Amino acid sequence: MSYLQEVITDVLENYPDKIERLVFVTTGKRPALFLKKHFAEQVKHATIAPEFIGIADLFTRISGVQPISNLPLLFEFYDCYTKTCKDTPDSFEEFLSWGQTALKDFSEIDQYLVNPDKIFPYIHALKEAEHWSGMDELSEMQKKHLAFWNSLGDYYFALNSKLTEMGKGYGGFIAKKAVEKLPKYLQTHTNTIHIFVGFNALSKAEQHVIQSILMDIGGEIYWDGDTYFLNNPTHDAGFFLRKYTNSWRYYQTHKPKFIQSNYEKEKELYLTGVPKSINQAHSVAELLKNTPTKALEKTALIIADENLLIPVLQAVQPKTSVNITMGYPLQQTPLNDLFVAYFRLHLSKSFYHKDILNLLSQPFLHTLLKEEVVRDISQYIKTHNLTYITRKKLFESVDETDHEMLTLLFPDAKGKALITTLIDNAITLIYRLKAQIDPESNTHLLTQEYAYRFFQLFNQLKQLQEQYGYIDSVKTLYHFYLDVLQKSSLNFRGEPLEGLQVMGVLESRSLDFDRVIITSVNEGVLPLGKSGDSLIPYDVKHVLELSTFKERDAVYSYNFYRILQRAKQVHLFYDTEMDSLKSKEKSRFILQLLAEKISTHKVIHQIKAPEVYPAILRPLTIEKTTAVIDALKVLAEKGISPSALTTYIRNPLTFYEQQVLHIYEEKEVEETVEARTFGNIVHGTLEDLYTPFLNEILTEEHIKKMQPLVLPTIEKRFEEEYRSTDFRTGKNWLIFNVIEKYVRSFLALELNEIKSGTEIIPLYLEQKIKIPFQAPHLPFPIYFKGIIDRVDRRNGVLHIIDYKTGIVEETDVRIKDWNNLITDIKYGKAFQLLTYAYMITKHLNINEKMIVANLSFKRLQKGLLPFHTYFDKEKDYDVTAKTLALYSEYTEELLREIFDINTPFYEKS
C-alpha cells in the first residue's frame, strides 16, 4: 500500500462519519489528484466528497490576497522603486540585475515572519562595517552602494503598501497576511477538519498556520518520514522532521503520525555511471525496452535535469502510454531560437549579416518565407560582401511581393515605437506560425503548446509596456526577454493515473512506485549545491533563521530518499564525463548509498561505457562513368588551371569534387581579409601601379612615380572587395598596413635592382592565357588556362613571375627526382611554375630559355626564387626546350590518368 493509500485508510478509520467536513491540504495538485483516486477506491458508500487543495490555495483563502504573476510584480516593483529612490534610479535594464533577486528575498523575509524593521537596518549596518576603514573617505561608488542598502527597506515597504492596495501579492506576502488573518479564519472554520499530507520543509508562516489549525480546530498532519533518517541525528533527510517533532508545541500532547520503517526493507539499487547525457538517455531507453509492460505501470522515470527530458523521450520507445508531469525550459524550445535571433538582429542600427542569415535560417520561418527570398538575400549579402546592410538595401534585394513578410522581421520604426512594433510583430509571427502547424505531425500538439506559452508571454509584455513603458531600448527588451525565458517553463500535464510516469523530482512528492529510474544524479543537479542568488548575507540569514544552502541541501536529501523509501528496485544514472571546465562529480547521495552497507539493500555500482566499434577506414574511390567523362570533356574544353592539376596531385578525390561536381566551400562574407582576398588586393595594386609602364625599361623615376600612388591604389582595391565595411578599423586596418608594407618593400626591391644595373621591361601583368596542351596520345583536345602574374625581360632574359603572399622555400621550386613530379605534392609549386612556362611558350610561340620564379612577399629580401633542376648533377636554373619536353612527357601521363575511364578517382591519405 502506498503512502497516500495509507493516509486515506487512516483518515476513514478515524473520521468515518465526518467525511464531508474534511479538507485535504497537499504540497501540490498532483498528490491531491492521487488522494482523490484512492479516496474514491476506498469509500464504499455514497457521500459528499471532501475538499482537496494545495497549501498555496489555502493561504490565498485565509489571507484574502490573490497571487500576482512574476512579470506584473516586477513592473510594479520598479514603479515603487523609482518613486521611492532618493537618488537617480537605475534604468530598467540595470534594475533587472537585482530586482528579481530582491523580490525573492522579500518573499523569504515574509515567509519566515522576519521583522522588516530589524533585518534591513541589520543588513545596512553590516555593509557599512565592510566599507569602514577609519581613515579614508568613501568614494562616490561606495556611497551609492551604501545608499542602496540603506534604501532597500524603503523599497520593501513601498511595494508592500502597493500590493496591499491592489489586494494582490507574492508568495511570502500572502503567507504573512495569512498569519495575520488566521484568527478570523479559525473562528469561521471550527467545523472544518484539515488533513495535511506530504509536507517536509515548512516556512515559519506555514508552521504557524498548520500548528494553529491543528491545536485550535483540530485535524491531522501525516508526515512521510522514516525511522532510519529520523533516528540518525546527522542524516539530512530527517532534518526537518526531527526539528518539528522536537520543537512544536503540538507534539507536547500528540505523537507524530506516519513515521514508518520502509527504507530498510529489501531493495535493489543499481548505481550506473555513464559518460555524456545522451548515453544516459540511451541507457534509460534500453532499460525500459527490457521491462515488461505490466511493470511499466508501476515505474517512475524521474528526470533530475530538465534539459535531459527531450533526449530521453526521443530515445524511449515505450510499450505503454507515457505521461509527463514536469516543466521543460522554454529557452530550450526551437521557438526561442527564433525570437533570440529576432531580437539580436535589432540590437544595432544596421543589420549585421550573420544576424540576418541566422534569423532567415530559423526552421519556423521556412513555412512563412519563400525559399527564393532567403536565397536572394543571402546571395546579395555574399556577392556584395556586406558585413552590415541597411533595411533599404535589404528590401531592394528581393521582389516587392515579398516585402510584407519581411516588414514583420525588419520593421521600419525607431525608439520606443520599435519596441512596441517588435512585440506586436512577435505576436503576429506566433499567429502565423500556429496557422502553419501541420496537424498530422507527431509534434504538433507540443508545438502548439509552447507557441501558446510564447503568445502569453509577449501578450503580457505588450500590456505591461503599454501601461508602464519602462522598456526603452531593444537592448533592454532583449535582456529582459532572456531573463524571463530563463525562469519560464512549459508545464506538461499528462494522465497521472496510468502508464509510464515521467516527472521531475518535485513532482514525485508523496508518490510511490515499485520501480524508480532517476537520471543525472550528479553534484550540482541532485543536490543543486550552493547558490548565491540572494542579496541577504549568509550571516544575517543564519542569525534570523532564514533558509540557507544547508536547509536547501536537507530538502534535496529528503526528496531523494523519500523516492527510495518504498521502492523495490532503483536505477540511478549519473554522468561521468569530464568537460573542459570541470568533471561531472557523482552525487553525494550515491556516495552515501555506497557507504550505508544496509544488509537488506543489494547495491550494484557499475560504470557503463557505450560500445565503440573501431571504424575500418577504406580509401574512398569513385569509378568514372560516361557521365563523368562527359563532364571531364567539358572541363578540358574550358581549360584546366595549373592549380587544378596540383589539386589532383594532392588528392584526386578533391579534384573530382571541385572540377566534376563543382563542390566548393560556400562563399562567406569576409569581415576580415582572408588569404585569397589579401592576394587579390596585392596583385591588383601592383597591376594598377605597373600598367602605365608596360613595354618600357623601368627607371628610378618610374618607381618614384609609383610610390605616392601606393596608398590610394590599395584603398581603391580594398573598397572594391569590401563595399560596406570600414576597413580602417580593427584587424582589416592592420592587414591594410601589412599590404602597404609589402608593396612598398617590393618597389624598394625593384629600385635596388634598377640601381644595380638590371634592365627590367615589364611585358604582361595578370595575363589571362588559354592554350591547347599538345600531346599525341590524349583521348581528346585538352586546354590549359590560367592567369600569369607577371612576365618581364630582365637583362634580355624572359622571366615569368608568380607572386606568393605566403612563405616559399628554395626547396619548393626545385626538382631532384622527375619521377615524382606528378605524384608528390611537395613538387606542387615547381609543377605550377613549369606549367606557366609551358603556357607562355605556346601563347607567344617562342622557343627560348627563360627563368620562371616565385616571389614570396614574406621573404622579399630573398628576391626571386627561380625554378631549378639537375641535369648531369649540375644545378640548372634555365627552363629550356629540354626542360619543357620532360615536363610535357610527365604531364601527358598525368592527363591520361585523369581522363582515363578505367582509372577511378581515389582518396589520398
Predicted regions located by residue number:
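Accessory C-terminal helicase-associated subdomains
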Residues: E140-K162, T190, V197, I217, ...
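RecB-family 4Fe-4S metal-dependent nuclease core
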Residues: D438, I517, S580, P619-S909
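Conserved motor-region signature of P-loop NTPase helicases/translocases
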Residues: M1-E51, I55-D57, Q187-S348, L511-D512, ...
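Conserved helicase NTPase motor core
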Residues: K127-E128, W132-F239, G273, D514-R515, ...
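Conserved helicase core region in the C-terminal RecA-like lobe
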Residues: G54, I193-L202, A300, D305, ...
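Accessory/regulatory regions of helicases
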Residues: D337, S350, K354-N358, N522-G639, ...
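Accessory helical subdomains and C-terminal extensions of nucleic-acid helicases
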Residues: K83-N115, N191, Q314-V322, K354-R453, ...
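Basic/charged alpha-beta structural segments of nucleotide/phosphate-handling enzymes
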Residues: K29-H189, K204, I381
